[in-house]
């Protein structure tokens, strides 16, 4: 095909110079597109999705890292949706939502330091918590299963040490508990973890229960039956020389976890017991002391 401009002795540039319509079209095409700032929530959304989908290499690490990653992502989403006034909403034990998040960040810090995570430097409480939790997850996910057996200090009023594996379950537990605290303080509905994660949290708490009982240890065992999502049956020796099962205690699994978190007064906690009623009460009261609040 012969170019009509050339066939009339004119180049395209000559035509554009003489034609106002073409000159305007070329100017529009040559104009650079203005740079657009990404939406403010984009970074948080991408990070939350990445944390949910992160798959640590070692199967044993997945078991404890994935539940924590899920609760971190849910907490991150929750905090991203708070406006200024909601950060000052009152919260029992910690004053405000902001104070509660600072408490959680401080409890997470012991495990983060153990894992070699750098100190968080974010400008806001949300940013500092998120940076630290993300760094902790990255290091745990890249670590080996052997590391999970190393003893570390647990959070809480009672001094206790446990393998890193259990400390990470506690991080999952406390993150969920405080997310529910924030939901309650800001008019949102509570949200329980997945059933398999509830089961893991309940098992973690029941392993600590004998140490939390007041008075001399008795040479008996207790069977605890937790019903509903995440439930199961555990028989717990209350001393190294435990003999027969002295009590069978039944309760709902998520309710039991909330009792352990200190979110259900032991005198009001719904449970059923067979055997020694006094021992059942002692177990419920001991469970209520295992939370992470100080």
What does each model-identified segment do?
Residues 99-106:
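Basic/polar, acidic-poor N-terminal "presequence/leader" segments
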């Amino acid at each position: 095909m012969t170019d009509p401009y050339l066939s009339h002795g004119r180049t395209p540039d000559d035509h554009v110079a003489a034609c106002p319509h073409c000159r305007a079209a070329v100017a529009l095409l040559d104009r650079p597109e203005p740079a657009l700032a990404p939406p403010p929530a984009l970074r948080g959304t991408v990070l939350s999705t990445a944390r949910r989908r992160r798959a640590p290499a070692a199967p044993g690490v997945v078991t404890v890292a994935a539940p924590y990653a899920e609760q971190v992502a849910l907490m991150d989403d929750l905090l991203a949706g708070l406006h200024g006034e909601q950060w000052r909403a009152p919260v029992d034990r910690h004053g405000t939502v902001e104070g509660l998040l600072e408490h959680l960040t401080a409890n997470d810090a012991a495990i983060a330091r153990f894992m070699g995570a750098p100190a968080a430097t974010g400008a806001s409480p949300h940013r500092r918590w998120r940076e630290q939790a993300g760094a902790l997850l990255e290091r745990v996910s890249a670590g080996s299963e052997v590391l999970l057996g190393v003893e570390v200090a647990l959070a809480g009023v009672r001094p206790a040490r446990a393998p890193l594996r259990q400390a990470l379950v506690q991080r999952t537990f406390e993150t969920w508990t405080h997310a529910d605290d924030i939901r309650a303080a800001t008019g949102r509905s509570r949200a329980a973890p997945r059933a398999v994660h509830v089961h893991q949290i309940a098992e973690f708490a029941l392993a600590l229960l004998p140490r939390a009982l007041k008075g001399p240890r008795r040479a008996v065992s207790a069977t605890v039956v937790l019903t509903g999502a995440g439930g199961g049956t555990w028989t717990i020796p209350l001393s190294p020389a435990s003999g027969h099962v002295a009590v069978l205690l039944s309760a709902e699994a998520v309710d039991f976890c909330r009792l352990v978190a200190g979110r259900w007064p032991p005198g009001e906690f719904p449970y059923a017991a067979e055997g020694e009623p006094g021992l059942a009460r002692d177990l419920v009261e001991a469970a209520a002391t295992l939370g992470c609040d100080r």
